[in-house]
Amino acid sequence: MRAVSDFLKNKWVAVPAVALLILSLGFLAQNYITGSFVSGDQIEYTSNSEFFDGEVFVINYIGDRTTDKIHAEIPASELASAADGEVTKELTIDITSQETYARYSTTSTSLSRIYAFKAINSEVFTDTSSSEVESRKQSWAEQNCYDIDGDSEIEQGDDYTQRFWVDGAIADYYNAQVYCVRENGYYGNIAELSSPDKEFEAEVEVKADGETPQSTTLSNSDLGQGRCDNIGEYVRACWTGLNPTGEGVPEPYNVYAIHSNTFSPEWRVISAERYSSYNSYVENNLYSQIEAWKEGSLSQEEVVSTANDQAAQAAQRVSSGSFTDYQVEDSSYENGQIRLNPSYDIAWPEFTFYVDGADYISVEKPVGEPRIVNVEGDEFGEKQSGTVTAEVENTASYEGSFSARVSKCSDSFGYDSLQETKTVGPGETVSFDFRVSFTSDSFDQKTVSGSCEIVVSDTGDSSNSDTAVVDVEATQSNECTPNEEFVRTINSTHSRILECSSDGLTTTEVDVCGDGEEAAFRDSSWTCVSDGTLPGGGDGSGGSGGGGDTDDCVVFAVGDLEIEDPFCADGPLEMLSKMFHLVAGTAVAFFTGSLGYRAGRWVDGEYQIKGGFDPLKSRSVSRAKRGRFLIGLIAELVSFLLGFYVILLVPIWAQLMVILGYVLFKYYTPF
């Protein structure tokens, strides 16, 4: 009692528990055993039960199979050891009796009934003719005699016999004396027995100290294998199967069943051997005894007595063999049921008992007491992640297993819902860190404030928990390129021209294109134009330089590099600009080609040779004078392309000013 008192002073928390007792019970009917204990290694403590809430005891028990009665005591110390807690009540399981038996069903057959007989005779005569007396004799026999050979025909020599004579002083009289037996009632219809079903009954009582015993009668004939039934309010039992004992179940090979309303009960198990003897007597001996009666060697009473003795023997209840101790459980002709109780156990039943520990077994288990003593939030940007932290202290005097998680966050803030579990000693503090994120569809730059909820509980008792709210802040990211215009489509039908603010976070609507209009890039800005003004039906999304305005002018593109058709232009002014580009490209090509020619001769040590770059010069000219033709040709081609497409970047007004300046410098002479 002192240990229990100290335990309660330490504020252990009562935990709802369920005792799950798995008992394999199989016994032979001899003695009554007391004190059959369960060893500690057969007890587990888990939190899985399909019938009751809370933790459960898993207590495995296997009977010693030496009795039909058992008294199993499960000490409180064994339960406490498995639960790692305190249990003050012992649990006892009493099987006050149990028996196993075989059940047989009756099956109708075409076997003949068992009849009682009466010996009869009659004299038939006529003065007409012998054929007439023969006809009258046969008619009488068919109406009164039993079909002994069972061929559905009443025949002389098989089913009846006769004496025939003729007499008369004045006229002839034809006489016939007929001898046979007829039915004088029957004992019943014959049926076969089906193969047996193994069944059991057990009187079970489960009791915890100081509680009302829970008891019932269990039988698989009511439950069915794997099914469960209640034993009172707090106990549930499941039958899980039958283990064979090694003893065979009697098969109904040597017996039949006979049904008659004159029997009590109406079904009776009879000997198959006696039934066969009765049939053999009728088929092989009854006719010869009728002949003996006709000849006078047997009396009429002796024939009847012998035949009816055979029938009575066949209809008697079986008196030897395995089926002497049976019970009729259903007397109806259609659903006859025979129960056989052998003198030995034919199987051992196995049970699983579920005992509600919350109300029936007191279990006290030490758990921790979590308290959140501090929380820390975080500030982070959009599409980034931050960390929230909770510091948790165990304020109990016992070790706790604390599980923490983020249960919810404000809108637009995401979180990882997985929980983290840590073991915390008495008075210790641990930290839990959780990742949070932020995502928004808004264009407005702003700081968004929110919060997340953190929940911590002890895994041994979820009611021991604490909750705290932590603040979080997130900053909206840029949504566009500062000071640039761009186009968005409204409902896939209309273009909307927007201008990005200087901070890249907000936009201003510039224009919305109407029906039949598209957004096109013109003179370094976006504008709405009619569909027909776009070459090739394009959307006018070209760049802002002096090149073409549509993608129709692009003949080659790799990444951001695009090469346009030099003769593709939007208007005469752009065509004039491209003509200047051709002139500039050609000039640059000849200049760089000459430079490449000179460089090639310099490399060959021919820098003192005079002459110009003329790739079409006669082949008789020395190789040294020709220089490196291939190098010069490649340099010329590259220079032309560079000259043409570099000049494309120069606006046309700048090109005109350069040309005008060159002309003035070349041809103008001041006074």
UniProtKB/Swiss-Prot annotation:
<dbReference type="InterPro" id="IPR049902">
    <property type="entry name" value="Fsx1"/>
</dbReference>
<feature type="disulfide bond">
    <location>
        <begin position="145"/>
        <end position="180"/>
    </location>
</feature>
<feature type="topological domain" description="Cytoplasmic">
    <location>
        <begin position="596"/>
        <end position="628"/>
    </location>
</feature>
<feature type="disulfide bond">
    <location>
        <begin position="409"/>
        <end position="452"/>
    </location>
</feature>
<feature type="transmembrane region" description="Helical">
    <location>
        <begin position="651"/>
        <end position="671"/>
    </location>
</feature>
<keyword id="KW-0106">Calcium</keyword>
<feature type="transmembrane region" description="Helical">
    <location>
        <begin position="13"/>
        <end position="33"/>
    </location>
</feature>
<dbReference type="GO" id="GO:0009986">
    <property type="term" value="C:cell surface"/>
</dbReference>
<keyword id="KW-0472">Membrane</keyword>
<comment type="function">
    <text>Exhibits fusogenic activity. Mediates cell-cell fusion in mammalian cells (bilateral fusion).</text>
</comment>
<feature type="topological domain" description="Extracellular">
    <location>
        <position position="650"/>
    </location>
</feature>
<comment type="subunit">
    <text>Homotrimer stabilized by interdomain contacts and numerous Ca(2+) and Na(+) ions.</text>
</comment>
<feature type="region of interest" description="Fusion loop">
    <location>
        <begin position="168"/>
        <end position="173"/>
    </location>
</feature>
<feature type="topological domain" description="Extracellular">
    <location>
        <begin position="34"/>
        <end position="574"/>
    </location>
</feature>
<keyword id="KW-1003">Cell membrane</keyword>
<keyword id="KW-1133">Transmembrane helix</keyword>
<keyword id="KW-1015">Disulfide bond</keyword>
<feature type="topological domain" description="Cytoplasmic">
    <location>
        <begin position="1"/>
        <end position="12"/>
    </location>
</feature>
<feature type="transmembrane region" description="Helical">
    <location>
        <begin position="629"/>
        <end position="649"/>
    </location>
</feature>
<comment type="similarity">
    <text>Belongs to the HAP2/GCS1 family. Fusexin 1 subfamily.</text>
</comment>
<dbReference type="GO" id="GO:0045026">
    <property type="term" value="P:plasma membrane fusion"/>
</dbReference>
<protein>
    <recommendedName>
        <fullName>Fusexin 1</fullName>
    </recommendedName>
</protein>
<dbReference type="GO" id="GO:0046872">
    <property type="term" value="F:metal ion binding"/>
</dbReference>
<dbReference type="GO" id="GO:0005886">
    <property type="term" value="C:plasma membrane"/>
</dbReference>
<keyword id="KW-0812">Transmembrane</keyword>
<feature type="disulfide bond">
    <location>
        <begin position="513"/>
        <end position="528"/>
    </location>
</feature>
<feature type="transmembrane region" description="Helical">
    <location>
        <begin position="575"/>
        <end position="595"/>
    </location>
</feature>
<keyword id="KW-0479">Metal-binding</keyword>
<feature type="disulfide bond">
    <location>
        <begin position="480"/>
        <end position="500"/>
    </location>
</feature>
